[in-house]
């Protein structure tokens, strides 16, 4: 699994993923910063990135139109880079060896706990 980190999140999340044994890129490192959300989708699709963002609403709308996608991780609260790293580490721990195809993982704080939830997206109509 490889991750593409959105420009709304800190570049240090790349190192968090790499330290956990994953391949990761940041939108800014690929000179994709400033592109519209829909302009990132072909890159995500072609390179089979699991996308990591804080911009859940916009990307859920885009991914909801995709019949197949490699997954999306949403860091729900808008927090400092230190807390982004903590939440992303929790998401990586949750994922483990799971296949995230057509899945969303949301990670957030609930009180003093970190909570990860995973669901199919778009929902299967079968």
Model-derived segments and spans:
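Short, surface-exposed amphipathic charged segments that create phosphate/polyanion-binding patches used
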Residues: 40-42, 84-93, 120-121
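Mid-chain, well-packed structural core segment of small domains
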Residues: 59-92
């Amino acid at each position: 699994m490889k991750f593409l980190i959105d420009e709304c999140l800190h570049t240090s999340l790349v190192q968090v993923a790499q330290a956990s044994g994953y391949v990761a890129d940041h939108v800014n490192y690929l000179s994709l910063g400033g592109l519209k959300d829909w302009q990132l989708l072909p890159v995500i699709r072609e390179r089979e990135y699991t996308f990591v963002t804080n911009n859940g609403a916009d990307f859920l709308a885009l991914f909801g139109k995709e019949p197949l996608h490699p997954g999306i991780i949403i860091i729900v609260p808008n927090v400092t880079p230190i807390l982004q790293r903590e939440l992303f580490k929790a998401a990586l721990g949750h994922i483990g060896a799971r296949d995230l195809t057509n899945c969303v993982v949301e990670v957030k704080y609930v009180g003093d706990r970190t909570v990860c939830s995973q669901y199919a997206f778009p929902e299967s109509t079968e």
